[in-house]
Amino acid sequence: MSLVVQAGNPALEQLGRSLTMDPLDPKDVVRRATSENVDLVVVGPEAPLVAGVADAVLDYGIPVFGPTKDAARLEASKSFAKQVMADAGVATARAFTCTTMDQVEAAFDDLGAPYVVKDDALAAGKGVVVTTDRAQASEHARACLSRDGGAVVIEDYLDGPEVSLFCFADGAT
């Protein structure tokens, strides 16, 4: 058995042979996967998942570990994830999706400090600010809103550990 990895991660490159490809281009990933006769493709980062890499690989008949483009929306949009949780009855922090600073300030008034401001777009884990400083929270919200289509999720602060899990499932149980 051998491991083929996307070039650019020195730790992974020590474990297998590295290839250069555009991880955001589903066709390029499929081309490289088929030329290497891979048995499984693992897609971890959010951006390639949102770009539909897992769908393209799966459509070509290669098993893939990673959610579909539709499922990746849960990571791509915090407001979408909040809506899915609400629709499914999953307990989560109270939150407001805001597209204007007036809405942000009203959410701050309603929820109080500490302020939790989450960029609604992909931010590679760097789109969240938790602070008791309202000016800092407002500054982050303003920066997120300044982009085309910008939105932020302002939510109640929950104290406790955060856990992220990657799991295998058989699709049935």
Show which residues each predicted segment covers:
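Short, intrinsically disordered, charge-balanced linker/junction segments flanking boundaries
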Residues: 1, 169-173
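ATP-binding N-terminal substructure of ATP-dependent carboxylate-amine bond-forming enzymes
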Residues: 1-70
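Short acidic-hydrophobic, aromatic-tinged amphipathic segments that line or gate anion-handling sites
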Residues: 18-25, 96-100, 131
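Short beta->alpha connector loops
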Residues: 24, 46-48, 98-102, 158
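Short, well-ordered alpha-helical microsegments
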Residues: 49-51, 104, 162-163
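A conserved helix-loop-beta module that forms one wall/lid of the active-site cleft
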Residues: 67-127, 134
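Conserved ATP-binding module of the ATP-grasp superfamily
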Residues: 91-93, 110, 114-117, 130-168
